[in-house]
Amino acid sequence: MFVTGESGMAYHNPFIVNGKIRFPANTNLVRHVEKWAKVRGDKLAYRFLDFSTERDGVARDILWSDFSARNRAVGARLQQVTQPGDRVAILCPQNLDYLISFFGALYSGRIAVPLFDPAEPGHVGRLHAVLDDCAPSTILTTTDSAEGVRKFIRARSAKERPRVIAVDAVPTEVAATWQQPEANEETVAYLQYTSGSTRIPSGVQITHLNLPTNVVQVLNALEGQEGDRGVSWLPFFHDMGLITVLLASVLGHSFTFMTPAAFVRRPGRWIRELARKPGETGGTFSAAPNFAFEHAAVRGVPRDDEPPLDLSNVKGILNGSEPVSPASMRKFFEAFAPYGLKQTAVKPSYGLAEATLFVSTTPMDEVPTVIHVDRDELNNQRFVEVAADAPNAVAQVSAGKVGVSEWAVIVDADTASELPDGQIGEIWLHGNNLGTGYWGKEEESAQTFKNILKSRISESRAEGAPDDALWVRTGDYGTYFKDHLYIAGRIKDLVIIDGRNHYPQDLECTAQESTKALRVGYAAAFSVPANQLPQTVFDDSHAGLKFDPEDTSEQLVIVGERAAGTHKLDHQPIVDDIRAAIAVGHGVTVRDVLLVSAGTIPRTSSGKIGRRACRAAYLDGSLRSGVGSPTVFATSD
């Protein structure tokens, strides 16, 4: 049992022995759910708050015994119509049937692929790309969505067209034929598709050992225990949304969820579910990207005519998946402190799909740590703390401490050598939560998942990991400072604004289609922290942004090379057209549009736009002044 002992005894996680995660033989989430069905069969497992018909929502509940029965039924049907190793894609709306679909795939011993209903706007191209990549034999959906799913896959050849099963139509009696799958710790449980910087998604192979390991790492970090309740609105096809909702399967207590749209429309719904319910003695936990905290602070505070809230029970809300803003956390706390929210409740964190999800978070007894470092030193890959009011001060939020039975080291990737604290390098990871590779991509898998750390420092962060351990390259820059992990910047090209992923190629394409004044194929889209934007942006009324030294939220920048014969054109109408097109097409504000002369934007040796090099030149001012060398810039990509 997950317990906190009396007389101030420390929190105890039953799966952690001598500081390391230890599972019984052949453990997996299927066995955990079956255990809860036996010992807590009449207790609530999951509650879906359905706001599609009622403004206050309709609670749709499932008990552990019924959850087990439905999982076994779907698992048995899959065992009847599929073969071991088959991929099973989940194209469900976010409701109880989605969870039954995911667990049904695990129960069958096949490989789950958590995706989304094709009716979800704006993701059709991505969904086709994923289905092309994983080639599922079967799709799980619901009766209501089945027609739309069949229409969606109709364009595929008959040979490539998966079988479609509506999970709510599978009779529970089918469960009688279910057989415990012969899956071991190395068997792939599901593919977590990443939001990579290219149009071709990559599916991270997560095994039946990776999954419970990471769930226990999260529960241990949150000190999850008997009586605690989870709450979420995150999409289940996202790694943070999936792992958060799976915490209940190991903890054995209830979890409440809603759709992302329900939260976005009325963020107070999330806040109200986090609050203490009558008779509850445990705490609540959740997870959300940074933008959600600001959104809730602005639109989620209870009205005077609404019942009072008690948020003193909120143990921890993981804040991750995008850069964490001190300003957003401050607004959230100021908005909800009057309702009992503790200063320790918000937990800046770090994670990625290659690690199943979780890597690090702020310790439970600590408030979020925000320090200020020198911008010039930061650009030179060093962390040097300065006063908050120093001229070159840049706010940095700690991502806390690395989870149990997991290692994160800062590495000079060129030499595969560990770097000392305070120096910025690439974050490399090792542990049983790390996936085994990308589905069908041997070369990429070897480059990312099969790295050897060639040298360690004297007080190594790799202490305890085998000398021949394989390390995962995250593609993220970071450092340790005063025993906390900090994420200095994203190496990846993906642009994340307000919790939403934007493919840079799409943004660049929209910019170029909005005007004939740009050279086709010569535009770069990237994001930078708001407090690192140049003063000219804040002086521009069109940018719509005021300077806040603590605002580290990512803001969109577009750099475009002028087309031949357009240098004498007034730049403002061009900039306005680009801003308007991206606002309409992507729902995001472009804070700066920089028009440069032909040949200015750096390109890689293979001819691709050097976005990271372009970003670096933008930050140091050389791109705007026109003194930088594209050849030099491109080497940093």
UniProtKB/Swiss-Prot annotation:
What EC numbers are recorded for this enzyme?
A: 6.2.1.20
Does the record bear Nucleotidyltransferase in its keywords?
no
Q: A Gene Ontology CC term for this entry?
A: plasma membrane
One example of the protein's molecular function in GO is: long-chain fatty acid [acyl-carrier-protein] ligase activity
Post-translational modifications reported in the UniProt record: Phosphorylated on Thr-552 by PknA, PknB, PknD and PknF. Dephosphorylated by PstP. Phosphorylation regulates activity.
Subunit structure as annotated in this protein's UniProt entry: Monomer in solution.
Extra notes?
Answer: Was identified as a drug target. Inhibited by a series of 4,6-diaryl-5,7-dimethyl coumarins that directly inhibit the acyl-acyl carrier protein synthetase activity of FadD32 and kill M.tuberculosis. They effectively block bacterial replication both in vitro and in animal models of tuberculosis. Quinoline-2-carboxamides have also potent anti-tubercular activity.
| Protein name per UniProt | Long-chain-fatty-acid--AMP ligase FadD32
Organism of derivation: Mycobacterium tuberculosis (strain ATCC 25618 / H37Rv)
